[in-house]
Amino acid sequence: MHVSTSSVPVAIGRLTLLAFGFALAGCQSLSKVKEPVAEPTPAPPVIQSPLATHQFQFDAATDAVVGELQVTKVEGEDTFSDIARRFNLGYEELVRANPGIDPWLPGEGREVVLPTQYVLPNAPHEGLVINLAQLRVFYFPKVAEGEPTTVITHPIGIGKVGWSTPEGSTKVVSKTKNPTWFPPASVRKEHREAGDPLPSKVPPGPDNPLGTHMMTLGWPSYLIHGTNKPYGVGMRSSHGCIRFYPEDIAQLYDDIPIGTKITVVNQPLVLGWHRDAMYLQAFPVLEDDQREHPSGADAVLKAGISDEMWQRVKAHSAQVDLQLVNHLVDKPLGIAVPVSRRGVTVDKFLYASRHVENRLPEGANWNGKEELLVSEEQFEAARSGVILPKPEAPKKAVKAPVKKAPAAAPTAKTAQVAKPPPVEKSFDVERATPVKKVTGGSAQPAGQR
């Protein structure tokens, strides 16, 4: 076949144009494939009423998690201490759950996580169960046969480093309203050396660190009591005793009979089943806890999951997210998170939680009234276990003597009836104010606080 040489350039040109057209079409197709599909903007969460999270009923045969996670927004000049008390949380609970936020200046409008969902400690559901790592107490009152299990939970303050609260079992030995405090020699020595000497006896009243209610334990020198410094609850601030908010100890006082069993554990990692998933709640290891704790997901699951819980995981065709477990253990937020539910991340779980108004929940123990204003210096001293020296009493002002002008010669007007010299009045506060004796209080055995 003969092809004219003059037609070759024309054919080549046509082929080139055709190829160029295909190339353009291909680029357009490629660009369409590469375009990311914009995810729909999630709807803003519905703001609901806050929940009071201190008393729950649950089925102990199937559940080991109570409460519900909540998120609120900072209002006005709120600090973490204000928000914590409002929602029956401890200060450290809020700090852990909200890393990177200034607890004194969180910023108006900023979202704050309220860790108001709790995995119950691995201990018998009987009497008072205290988890030191959790800085929280769980009270299981006796219920009639066939009724659901009830648990009451509150934040607590525990012994600071060097004055740690012991672990083990004991019981309530006695109860006292409006107790008198006799500071033990060790505590008086510590305060004296810090420039804050204590009296040998502190009567009931606003200056009494035991607060208005006290329970003595089978352990000598250790107490459960209220406090005159509520901001110290939810942290390591005591000399080994267990501190409650005033409103919380007042509620529990009448409900807890003498002889109630007390179990104190120290569990930084707690696992529990709730509905369709296994939850993990991780807390920082206490500074003076020298034990070796599991650090990897495999070790955590091996140490914390019972055969019964494994059977539940299998029954729900669930799979534990090892990456999520490692994340929670490495960065313990103190938030109960489901680790056997597909597609869960901490951020997604927080977003899906209950967003609430920043106000006192219905049914809360606290009445919302502050008893004591505290400075940041006082607060941080309590948190770090430092005793501030007692402030010096203001010195009395001494008036400089005034030189009197020489007396003028009496005149007809002044030479009348002489007035008596003015009498200087003195006011003895101690004598002028009647002292009211307080009865009904009693001393505790060489207790700390």
Task: Tell what function each PLM region has.
Residues G76, E92-G100, R110-E126, I152-G159, ...:
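N-terminal post-signal-peptidase region of extra-cytosolic proteins
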